[in-house]
Regions:
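Beta-sandwich interaction modules
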Residues: 71-90, 451-455
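Surface-exposed beta-strand/loop patches in noncatalytic accessory domains
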Residues: 2-18, 40-81, 377-379
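Edge beta-strands of jelly-roll/beta-sandwich modules across compartments, strongly enriched
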Residues: 48-50, 104-115
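Solvent-exposed, flexible loop/coil segments flanking beta-strands in beta-rich domains
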Residues: 1-42, 113-124
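Extracellular and analogous surface-interaction loops
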Residues: 25-34, 84-90, 349-351
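Catalytic cores of extracellular degradative/oxidative enzymes
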Residues: 133-275, 283, 289
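Noncatalytic modules at the cell exterior or secretory-pathway interfaces
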Residues: 34-37, 86-105, 460-464
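Charged catalytic cores and adjacent phosphate/nucleic-acid-binding surfaces used
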Residues: 113-118, 188-202, 235-491
Length: 491
């Protein structure tokens, strides 16, 4: 969703008599604003022409100064151009500061453009699980940030093992990336992320369910969001029970594999029993790797603000879609004005005569999309991309460039499953996998985008979507996208 911006064009003539003085071009900020973009220009005129510097003040203080080094800059609540301070944008009189360093006899005219971005809903993409040199990763903080930016991500969670030092090493706001503070509680009996608080854990040394309950409960009291990580991983499963305080489960950890299928099946069972648990995913990236990469999977979060708290609010509401890659298949599910993470109220169900669903699918490349409810799979669609629009992309193109076939690439990813189970990892329950007796409908998608409609039933607890892609020569499919549910209020 594009930002709706309001634009001002301001002009300030500068006379020779004002040379070597500081001038203000005032403008008013009214109502909520999350970002201000400023650009300026004037006729330079070569060596004998004017030289005008620029900066910015708020109603309270000087916000920053570029001198003559920049022609444009921005300030936001949590991001800003280097040389400027991020922070809440207060209402009142602001001013662009002009430094009239050199002004010719004929004077100069400076044109200043000011754009305001109001808070608005938008999808933001990021990675909610990664490591750095602050624990057992090899990425420095700058390397991790650069990697995430190169992948087109807009936020990253700092989740090193049992330490908060990474959060304090990244105190300065980044111009392009939101940095979500976090920690991965890493015990000998399982791992859990705590997001949103720089120093959430008092003590990570938990060895019993009671100690885990105390530690995670205290983290939540401090404002932390708790996600149980890779709970069915053969080498580090969650063995402290599911009665501890938590908000989400990491259904998708790194490449799609059996441990994720088991987490997905468990999550589906909990949803079908009426329990509301948010599904999350993250790369768990530690170092450069062909398969484990920042943003694989990507968490797309619907947020009302380009801030850490805005992203966390979207996550807490369950407004999360998980994608294999930042540019891979993405889906949206809605019933009228109620979307992913929302509960459709009973009065709306009755007024609509059920639950009419709208399904939007973007960037699909031959995926099979399944609509799930608490009863299982309700409908299946095969998304067929016309031949002239079916060029390989994402990880498929990457594999080809590396000289690998897609089959070998995915086969190597699935080799992660070679780890021996510890005996505490449950089998995938019958009926909880993507296998279904529902006949798929063939849908041709022009430019890999399609909109579908489905008439849902009022007696379902929820609806959610999965998209998978079969790989020729393998008996397994790879998840390309999945949504959190849209819930249905029951009578």
């Amino acid at each position: 969703m594009e930002t709706k911006k309001e634009r001002l064009v301001l002009r300030r003539p500068i006379g020779k008599h004002e040379e070597r003085s500081y001038l203000e071009v005032a403008f008013a900020v009214e109502g909520p604003v999350e970002r201000i973009d400023i650009a300026y220009r004037y006729e330079r005129g070569g060596a004998s022409g004017p030289v005008v510097d620029i900066g910015l003040r708020s109603p309270e203080r000087i916000v920053g100064w570029s001198g003559g080094a920049r022609e444009a800059f921005f300030v936001g609540t949590e991001k800003a151009t280097p040389g400027y301070l991020a922070g809440p944008i207060a209402e009142g009189e602001w001013a662009v500061l002009l430094g009239a360093y050199k002004i010719p006899e004929g004077g100069a005219e400076v044109i200043v453009e000011v754009e305001f971005a109001r808070p608005h809903g938008r999808w933001m993409k990021g990675d909610l699980h990664m490591h750095s040199v602050h624990s057992d990763g090899s990425y420095t903080m700058e390397q991790a940030k650069d990697s995430c930016k190169s992948r087109g991500l807009e936020f990253m969670a700092l989740t090193d093992h049992n330490t908060a030092s990474q959060n304090f090493a990244a105190l300065a706001p980044d111009e392009q990336l939101l940095l979500i503070p976090g920690v991965e509680l890493t015990s000998y009996f399982g791992h859990a992320n705590v997001l949103g608080v720089p120093d959430a854990l008092r003590d990570f040394r938990v060895t019993t369910p009671e100690q885990a309950e105390e530690a995670l409960g205290e983290a939540r009291e401090r404002g932390g969001f708790v996600s149980l990580n890779h709970p069915f991983c053969p080498s580090c499963p969650w063995e402290l029970g599911f009665d501890v305080p938590f908000d989400a489960i990491e259904v998708w950890n790194g490449p799609w594999r059996t441990l994720n299928e088991r987490a997905l099946a468990w999550w589906q069972e909990q949803l079908a029993q009426g329990r509301r648990i948010i599904a999350l995913g993250g790369s768990d990236a530690h170092r450069e790797d062909r398969f484990v990469k920042h943003g694989r999977p990507t968490a797309s979060v619907w947020t009302e603000a380009d801030t850490v708290q805005g992203v966390l609010a979207g996550i807490r509401q369950g407004r999360v879609v998980l994608q294999f890659d930042p540019d891979e298949t993405c889906m949206a599910l809605a019933s009228g004005k109620y979307g992913i993470g929302d509960t459709i109220p009973r009065h709306a169900v009755e007024e609509q005569g059920g639950v009419p669903l709208t399904i939007d699918i973007c960037s699909a490349k031959g995926d099979r999309v399944a609509l799930w409810s608490d009863r299982g799979i309700e409908a299946v669609w095969d998304i067929v991309v016309p031949a002239d629009n079916s060029d390989a992309g994402g990880w498929e193109a990457e594999a080809a460039e590396a000289g690998w076939t897609v089959q070998r690439e995915i086969a190597a990813i699935l080799a992660f499953d070679a780890q021996e189970d510890k005996g505490c990892v449950p089998a995938i329950p019958a009926g909880a996998s993507a296998e279904s007796g529902v006949a798929p409908q063939r849908i041709e998608a022009e430019n890999a985008h399609v909109r579908l409609r489905f008439q849902g039933s009022a007696d379902r607890l929820f609806y959610r979507l999965e998209a998978r892609r079969d790989v020729e020569g393998l008996k397994r499919s790879v998840m390309t996208c999945m949504t959190n549910p849209v819930y249905v209020e029951q009578a």
